[in-house]
């Protein structure tokens, strides 16, 4: 059994779903710190966005919290990809729709 298979078995035994295990496997294969997103409260979509941001070396760690929905994490990642100051909207108390609105406004201001 390979090291990757052993790690996946560990997460399978802890109740992670097939899609979550796929994200874990992709993270292991890309050599990122999977510990940032292998928390039980993250669904596969949140894990996907966190994994992709880690692979791009974006500073997602402060926002890798299960208090955010996957759509909120998505908006934070989109902002980080554009080099925006996501602290303006990175709050679990702000809906993802409002986050999107703020992010788009920040993008517009950066393009002026």
Regions picked out by a protein language model, each given a short descriptive name:
Residues 1-112:
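General marker for long, soluble alpha-helical cores
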């Amino acid at each position: 059994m390979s090291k990757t298979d052993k790690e996946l078995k560990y997460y399978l035994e802890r109740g992670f779903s097939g899609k979550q295990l796929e994200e874990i496997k992709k993270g292991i294969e890309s050599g990122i710190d999977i510990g940032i997103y292998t928390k039980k409260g993250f669904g596969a979509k949140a894990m996907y966005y966190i994994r992709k941001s880690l692979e791009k070396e974006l500073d997602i760690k402060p926002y890798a919290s299960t208090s955010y929905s996957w759509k909120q994490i998505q908006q934070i990642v989109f902002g980080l990809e554009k080099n925006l100051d996501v602290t303006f909207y990175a709050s679990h108390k702000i809906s993802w729709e409002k986050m999107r609105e703020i992010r788009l406004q920040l993008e517009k201001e950066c393009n002026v």
